[in-house]
């Protein structure tokens, strides 16, 4: 199995990136490839999960081991496949997600694409108590899932508004990491204005 890839980041797409290793280009599917955009044409070390099916072999890539570990736990949950796990990781703060699981916060979990109440309950049933042994969660983070779900809803609404204005999925994904990096509590209007300013650069 391929645990990580180290090479030159050659290109980015909407769902994947390509890393050149000794003249061979490895396509790696990521939650949001544009979190790596500042490393384009530079050396990159990316954690990978080698997913083998009867009809395909796919490399999934992650920013760090924590993100990779959470991916492996998510795909162990009944009803969540690799695509569903990636959709969750694309919009989640790991500590906030774990706090939501521990708090049995259905509202937070159903804020992710493709996660209904039944799947949210299954996530809680399968993962509660199993993530805190690996990830340390503070009391403050334990209480923070309400603000996190509000942030997720803000980002989601802002991204849909940008698409309605004619921006492509690729352009929207490019600005999302910059919005999240500031970690500010924004209204939808503020998030849209900030995203438009970034897109205008």
Swiss-Prot record:
> Is Nucleotidyltransferase tagged as a keyword?
no
Q: Which NCBIfam families match?
A: ruvA
Note down the stretches annotated as region Domain III. Answer: 150-201
| SUBUNIT field | Homotetramer. Forms an RuvA(8)-RuvB(12)-Holliday junction (HJ) complex. HJ DNA is sandwiched between 2 RuvA tetramers; dsDNA enters through RuvA and exits via RuvB. An RuvB hexamer assembles on each DNA strand where it exits the tetramer. Each RuvB hexamer is contacted by two RuvA subunits (via domain III) on 2 adjacent RuvB subunits; this complex drives branch migration. In the full resolvosome a probable DNA-RuvA(4)-RuvB(12)-RuvC(2) complex forms which resolves the HJ.
Q: Which UniProt keywords apply?
A: Cytoplasm, DNA damage, DNA recombination, DNA repair, DNA-binding
Cite the residue spans of the region called Domain II: 64-142
Q: Which SMART domains match?
A: HhH1
Which protein, by its recorded name, is this? Holliday junction branch migration complex subunit RuvA
State the compartments where it is located: Cytoplasm
């Amino acid at each position: 199995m391929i645990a990580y890839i180290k090479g030159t980041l050659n290109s980015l797409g909407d769902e994947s990136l390509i890393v050149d290793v000794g003249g061979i280009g490895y396509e790696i599917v990521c939650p949001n490839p544009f979190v790596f955009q500042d490393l384009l044409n530079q050396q990159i070390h990316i954690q990978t999960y080698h997913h083998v099916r009867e009809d395909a072999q796919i490399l999934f890539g992650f920013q760090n081991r924590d993100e990779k570990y959470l991916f492996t736990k998510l795909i162990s949950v009944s009803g969540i496949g690799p695509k569903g796990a990636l959709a969750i990781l694309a919009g989640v703060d790991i500590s906030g997600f774990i706090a939501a699981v521990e708090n049995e916060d259905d509202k937070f979990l159903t804020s992710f694409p493709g996660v209904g109440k039944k799947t949210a309950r299954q996530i809680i049933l399968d993962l509660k108590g199993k993530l805190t042994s690996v990830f340390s969660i503070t009391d403050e983070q334990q209480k923070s899932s309400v603000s996190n779900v509000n942030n997720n809803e803000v980002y989601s609404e802002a991204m849909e508004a940008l698409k309605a204005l004619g921006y492509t999925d690729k352009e929207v994904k490019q600005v999302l990491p910059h919005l999240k990096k500031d970690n500010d509590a924004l209204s939808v209007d503020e998030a849209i204005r900030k995203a438009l300013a970034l897109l205008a650069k």
